[in-house]
Amino acid sequence: MAMPKLTYEEAGVNVQEGQRAVNLMKESVKSTFTKGVLGDIGGFGGLFALDPREMEKPILVAGTDGVGTKLKLAFMMNRHDTIGEDCVAMCVNDILCQGAKPLFFLDYIATGKLKAEVVAEIVQGIANGCKKAGCALIGGETAEMPGFYQKGEYDVAGFTVGMVEEKNLITGKEISQGDIMIGISSSGVHSNGFSLVRKLFFEDKQYSVDQYVDGLGETLGEALLRPTKIYVKPILEVLQQEKIKGMVHVTGGGFYENIPRILPEGIDANVHLDTWQAPPIFQFIQQEGQIEQDEMFSTFNMGIGMIVVVERSAGEKVVQLLQELGEEASIIGEMVRGSKQVVLCQK
């Protein structure tokens, strides 16, 4: 008896559904295109033309990241239109810390069974993030991998390249005693600490994502899924007017792991806890989980998504500039003699 002929679709890969996803996302992708983009959607590689007249000695800065287990929350809520924005934010905010202006972005989406509408929603979020960052979405990969992911789940990762003038590269090496830290508010939990959050709320406490929380003024799911803020445009505007010595994207590891990444030898960062109040979502997490302060600051951004370090004399002006650009910003600490430690203290 002849064996039935096997097809790729019978093995779990639907090429037609993949093409339908491409068709659904085309307009979103094209809406991000900037003057440097060459070619159209569907090429083997994304093309981007650098303008050599823009900088004397341009340095390319690259970054890659994902969204982590915040994706699980998107699955629980069956909402996929913001998680792509998180992915862009995690990448572009990182390269921004070295003064780089993002030029272009590529994405990677992998799932067990491809649903064109879900992929299109994810890409819409990526496109929204790219537009907020002023960069172009020039390529990506959507992988259907049967048997690899749980039903209805997927993973998202991104990659970005930006450019900075060599003399304007920000490394933190110039940070010195007396410099001050300016904290710029986050939009919420951003994209870190979700393994703790999910265990606390949805395993231990048995909350629902649809549960309204009085202290938050919204459902728990809405508060947690809010996209990571993208700081590119306000920071680049500040850099046109003032010198920034160092920048910290407060992500995984919170204050304790991220601030030391820019500290030179012989310097500590004193963070003044009485200069801002952690937003309600962090107070709720700490209260419900009976979590120690150090653990909170080791895990979450605590309401501060980006920190910039400037000379003390420029502090008030930079704060004012950021506020004029629509950001909540304040001086939250200073650099002192030490050994590359982060010290939580009162002003």
Swiss-Prot record:
Keyword ATP-binding: yes
Gene from which the chain derives: purM
Pfam families: AIRS, AIRS_C
Protein name: Phosphoribosylformylglycinamidine cyclo-ligase
Signal peptide region: none
Lineage: Bacteria, Bacillati, Bacillota, Clostridia, Peptostreptococcales
GO MF, one example: ATP binding
Catalytic reaction equation(s): 2-formamido-N(1)-(5-O-phospho-beta-D-ribosyl)acetamidine + ATP = 5-amino-1-(5-phospho-beta-D-ribosyl)imidazole + ADP + phosphate + H(+)
Family indicated by similarity: Belongs to the AIR synthase family.
GO biological process: 'de novo' IMP biosynthetic process; adenine biosynthetic process
Pathway: Purine metabolism; IMP biosynthesis via de novo pathway; 5-amino-1-(5-phospho-D-ribosyl)imidazole from N(2)-formyl-N(1)-(5-phospho-D-ribosyl)glycinamide: step 2/2
Major localisation: cytoplasm
Localization in the cell: Cytoplasm
Keywords: ATP-binding, Cytoplasm, Ligase, Nucleotide-binding, Purine biosynthesis
An annotated GO cellular component: cytosol
Enzyme class: ligase
The organism's place on the tree of life at top rank: Bacteria
Family annotation (NCBIfam families): purM
Organism: Alkaliphilus metalliredigens (strain QYMF)
InterPro entries linked to this entry: PurM-like_C_dom, PurM-like_C_sf, PurM-like_N, PurM-like_N_sf, PurM_cligase
Keyword Ubl conjugation recorded: no
E.C. no: 6.3.3.1
